[in-house]
Amino acid sequence: MDELLIQDPEVGRAVTLEIERQTGKLELIASENFVSAAVRQAQGSVLTHKYAEGYPGKRYYGGCEFVDIAENLAIDRAKAIFGCGYANVQPHSGSQANMGVYFACLKPGDTILGMNLSHGGHLTHGSPVNFSGRLYNVVFYGVKKETGYIDYDEVAALAREHKPTLIVAGASAYPRTIDFARFRAIADEVGAKLMVDMAHIAGLVATGLHPTPIGQAHFTTTTTHKTLRGPRGGMILSDEDNAKTLNSQIFPGIQGGPLMHVIAAKAVAFGEALRPTFVDYQQQVVKNAARLAGCLTAAGYDLVSGGTDNHLMLMDLTAKDITGKDAEHALDKAGMTANKNTVPFETRSPFVTSGVRLGTPALTTRGMKEAEMEKVAAWIVDALANVNNETRLAAISREVEVFARQFPLFAW
C-alpha cells in the first residue's frame, strides 16, 4: 500500500477507504468473503506478467514452465476437493464457466430449462438480458408458492413438455438443499444433459455439508470465491471424457490468455480447502446462518421457505411494506452491507424488489459465531424498524463499528 499511495494517491485512497469499509462494517452479502493473506499474495505476484495461452505442457508461449506448476496444482487440488476426473481452472468468472459448458453442449436456439431469476436462479441460467437468454430458447421452473421449495414436479412436467437439451440446476438466492439426484433422473428421462451451477454452495459441497453434484451432473460449474473463499474466478468440473471439448470451449473458444496470478491464487485457496480447518469453517457458516435466520423469524420477519439449510437466507419484506431497496439503504447506513433481492412471485421491479438477501460466509471468516449472530440480528431488526430514522441508523452504525473492529479482516 505504501508504494501505491506514493505512485497513485487517488487509487491508493480508494483502496484505503475500502479497507476501512470492510473493517468497520458487517458484510452480509451472501456472495462475498474474505481471502487469506496467502491468496492475496499469490494474486498480487509476478505471475500477473505472464501470458500462457493454452494448457499446461501445451502452451503457445515460451517460459511457462513455472506457471504450469501453479495451474497443475490448482487442477489437482480441485479434483481432490470434489472427487472428479477433470477440472478447468481457467474461466475468469462463473459466467464464463457457464458459457463454456453451454458452448460445449448447445447450439444457438437449443432449449435450456433453468431456474427463474426471481425465484432464486442466476442471470446466466437464461435471463433474457443475458447471453444465455439471447442465444438459447429458455424455459423456466421455480419454487412452490406455499413452501418456497423447488417444485420438482413442475421441473419434470416442463422437461417432458419442452424436451430441453440442457437442464440447469443451481441458484444464487435459494436457501434450501438441492436434490441433484432428482434433477438427474428428470434429465435422463427426457434425454437432456444436466449442468449444476454450485457457485454459492461449493464450500459446503467440498466439506460434505451439501450433497455433491459430482456423479449426478454431466457438468458442474462454480465460482472460486463465495463459500470456497478463494479469488474471484470460475471453474468447470466434469469427467475426463469431456476434457477435450470443454478445454477447447474455454480456450480458444471464449478466452485468450488465462490469468495466471489468479490461477495461482485459486491453487492456494484450494490447498486451504483441503485442510481440516476448512470443514470447521463451513460448519460454522451453516450454524451461523441457522441462528441468524432463527432470530429474524422470531422477530416476526418472513424468510422465503421459512429458513435456511445453507449459508444464505432471503428476507421477504412484503408484509412489512418495506422495499428491498429501502432496506438495503437502511442497513448500509446502519453499518451492514446486504443486497436487495427479488423474492418468488415478485410484484416490484428488480431495481426496487421486496426482499433482502443475507449470508454468513464473510462474518464467519472474521471469527463470528452464534452469539454474534444474535447481535447482528438485533441490529438488522432495529435498522429495519427505523428505515427513515437517520439518527437511529447512525447510532446503530457506531455500535456496529465498535463491534466489527473486534474481528480483524486479516486474522488468517
Swiss-Prot record:
GO terms for cellular component: cytosol. It comes from the Bacteria. The record marks 225 as: Plays an important role in substrate specificity. It is an enzyme of class 2 (transferase). Keywords: Amino-acid biosynthesis, Cytoplasm, One-carbon metabolism, Pyridoxal phosphate, Transferase. GO terms for biological process: glycine biosynthetic process from serine; tetrahydrofolate interconversion. One of its GO terms (molecular function) is pyridoxal phosphate binding. Pathway: One-carbon metabolism; tetrahydrofolate interconversion; Amino-acid biosynthesis; glycine biosynthesis; glycine from L-serine: step 1/1. (6S)-5,6,7,8-tetrahydrofolate binds at residues 117, 121-123, 349-351. Its EC number is 2.1.2.1. InterPro entries: PyrdxlP-dep_Trfase (IPR015424), PyrdxlP-dep_Trfase_major (IPR015421), PyrdxlP-dep_Trfase_small (IPR015422), Ser_HO-MeTrfase (IPR001085), Ser_HO-MeTrfase-like (IPR049943), Ser_HO-MeTrfase_PLP_BS (IPR019798), SHMT-like_dom (IPR039429). The modification N6-(pyridoxal phosphate)lysine is found at residue 226. The keyword Lipid metabolism does not apply. Its cofactor is pyridoxal 5'-phosphate. Belongs to the SHMT family. Catalyzes the reversible interconversion of serine and glycine with tetrahydrofolate (THF) serving as the one-carbon carrier. This reaction serves as the major source of one-carbon groups required for the biosynthesis of purines, thymidylate, methionine, and other important biomolecules. Also exhibits THF-independent aldolase activity toward beta-hydroxyamino acids, producing glycine and aldehydes, via a retro-aldol mechanism. This is Serine hydroxymethyltransferase. It comes from Nitratidesulfovibrio vulgaris (strain DSM 19637 / Miyazaki F).
